[in-house]
Amino acid sequence: MSIRNDNASGGYMQPDQSSNASMHKRDLRVEEEIKPLDDMDSKGAVAADGEVHLRKSFSLWSILGVGFGLTNSWFGISTSMVAGISSGGPMMIVYGIIIVALISICIGTSLGELSSAYPHAGGQFWWSLKLAPPKYKRFAAYMCGSFAYAGSVFTSASTTLSVATEVVGMYALTHPEFIPKRWHIFVCFELLHLFLMFFNCYGKSLPIISSSSLYISLLSFFTITITVLACSHGKFNDAKFVFATFNNETGWKNGGIAFIVGLINPAWSFSCLDCATHMAFEVEKPERVIPIAIMGTVAIGFVTSFCYVIAMFFSIQDLDAVLSSTTGAPILDIYNQALGNKSGAIFLGCLILFTSFGCVIACHTWQARLCWSFARDNGLPLSRLWSQVNPHTGVPLNAHLMSCAWITLIGLLYLASSTAFQSLITGCIAFLLLSYIIPVICLLAKKRNIAHGPFWLGKFGFFSNIVLLGWTVFSVVFFSFPPVLPVTKDNMNYVCVVIVGYTAYSILYWKYKGKKEFHALEESENEQAEYSNNFDTIEDSREFSVAASDVELENEHVPWGKK
C-alpha cells in the first residue's frame, strides 16, 4: 500500500519547504476558526453563491451503515434464495458465496482506489470524467452515470420486491389454503415502496437510521442463526449434504450452466459496493473513510452470509419440501422446519423484515444521491429540477421522488413474468458492473499512472482491475440466461431486452440532447474544497489552501488510517 499526502480532489499538495514554525501556528489558527457545516442553522449548507449543499453529517460508522445496510449480504442470501437454491442446492450457495466474496474483494479494491484518488458524490461517472481521454471524457462520464443510475433503480426495485415476497410468504406460511399470486406480491410491493420512501424525505434522521441499520442487521443475524441451531436439537444434516450434494431443478442438462445461473443469488448479495462512494460530500476525509467502508462491507458481508448459510443448510430437514413450497420464500420454510413451529418462523421472518427496511432505505439514499449528482451535470431530462437540494429537509428530495416513481413503474414487470425478480436482480448486477468498468478501463489505459490517494494497493490493484473486467463480461452474459427450461413467455429472463433497450436509449439521448446539455465540467478547486474540507464559505477554503500544505507536512510519515 502506498501512503502519500493527498488534497481534497485526490491529487497531491507540494509542501513549501520554506515554511517555518510561526507559519504553522498561524495556519493552524485559521483551521481552528473554520465553522463546520454541521453547526449551521440551515438543514443544508449554503455556499457563497447561495446554492444549497449537502451537510457533512455522516461518520465512518454511519457510512458503513449505509454501505452494509444496502449490500447486507446475509439478508440478500435469505430473500433471493428462491433464485439460487434450485440451481444446485445448498452446495451452490455455499461455494458461490466464497467465489463471489473473493471477486468482491477485487471490486472493492478497484472502487476503493478510485474513491480515494477522486472522492466525489458522482462516484464512477466522476472518475470516468477525470480519467478518460479528453475527446471521450464527456461521453464516458455520461454513459457511466447513466448505467450507474439505472443500476441503483433496479437495486431498489429488486430489494423492495424481495421484501414484498417475504411478507406474502409469511402470510402463506400461516394460511396453507392461500396460494400467492403475482398480483398479491405486486400490491404488497407498491404499498411497501410507498411507506419506505418517506424515510428519505428528511435528511437529519438518515445518519441515525444508517447506523441503526448496521446494528439491527447484525443483531438479527445473530438471533436467527443461534435460534435455528439451538432449536434443531442436534438433528443436523451431514457435511456431504451441505458441501457435496448438487441438486439441479432448473431443467438445464448441463450442471455447470445451472451452477453459473444460480450464482446470481450470492452475486446480488454482494452487489452495490459503490454505495458509500456517493456519500463523499457528506463525510469528513472521504478519501480515507470511503475505502474503509467499502472493504468493511465486503468483510462483514462474507462473515455473516457464510456463517448464516452454513447454519441454515445444516438445519434443513427436508430439501424437497423447501423446493416445492408455495410460500415463494424458501428461507421461511427452513425456519419452520428447524423450529417446528410457524409462530417461531414468523418471528424470525419479522427480524428479516426489520432488516429489510434498513436495506431499502439505504437503497433510496444511494439512488437519490446518484440521481442528484448526475443531474448536476445535466445528465437527465429536466436536470435542473432533480439537481436541487431541498433547503428545508437537507436532502435531494426531487431526485428521490423521481427515482421512486421509476421504481413504481418497474414493479409492473413482475406482472408480466414469473421470473421478473430474477430479471430485476440481473439488471441490478449488470448495470452496476457496466458502470464500474468504464473508469477502470480508463485507469488501465493510463497504466494506473495517476496521482492516487492514500488507499492504493499497487500490483494487487492491477490484478483487481482485471478481475473486475472479466467478471463483468461473465455476469452480463451468463446472468442473462433463462433461469429455467423450457423457456416460455412467462418465465423468460427479459433482462437482455432491458439492457439493450436502455443502452440504446442512453446513446440516442446523448446524440440528440445529452451531447449539447451534459456539461460534466470539472468543479472549480474552490467548490471541491468547500465540500471536502467542510467550509461554509469559499473565502474560508481560500484561507485554508495556504495552510494546507504546511499542516499536512507535519503528518507526512504517519501511516494511513492514523492521521
Swiss-Prot record:
Coiled-coil segments: none
Reactions mediated catalytically: choline(out) = choline(in); ethanolamine(in) = ethanolamine(out)
GO cellular component, one term: cell periphery
Modified residues (Phosphoserine): 22, 42
Annotated stretches, region: Disordered: 1-25
Gene Ontology biological process terms from the UniProt entry: (R)-carnitine transport; choline transport; ethanolamine transport; gamma-aminobutyric acid transport; glycine betaine transport
UniProt keyword Transport, yes or no: yes
Residue numbers on the Extracellular membrane side: 1-57, 109-182, 227-255, 315-342, 418-426, 487-491
Keywords: Amino-acid transport, Glycoprotein, Membrane, Phosphoprotein, Transmembrane, Transmembrane helix, Transport
Residue numbers on the Cytoplasmic membrane side: 79-87, 204-205, 277-293, 364-398, 446-465, 513-563
Membrane topology: Multi-pass membrane protein
Residues listed as glycosylation sites in the UniProt record: 7, 20, 248, 341
Cited Pfam families: AA_permease_2
Major site of localization recorded for this protein: membrane
UniProt GO MF annotations: (R)-carnitine transmembrane transporter activity; choline transmembrane transporter activity; ethanolamine transmembrane transporter activity; gamma-aminobutyric acid transmembrane transporter activity
Annotated transmembrane regions: 58-78, 88-108, 183-203, 206-226, 256-276, 294-314, 343-363, 399-417, 427-445, 466-486, 492-512
Superkingdom of source: Eukaryota
Subcellular location: Membrane
Family annotation (NCBIfam families): 2A0304
Family (UniProt): Belongs to the amino acid-polyamine-organocation (APC) superfamily. Amino acid/choline transporter (ACT) (TC 2.A.3.4) family.
Name of the protein: Choline transporter
Gene, per the UniProt record: HNM1
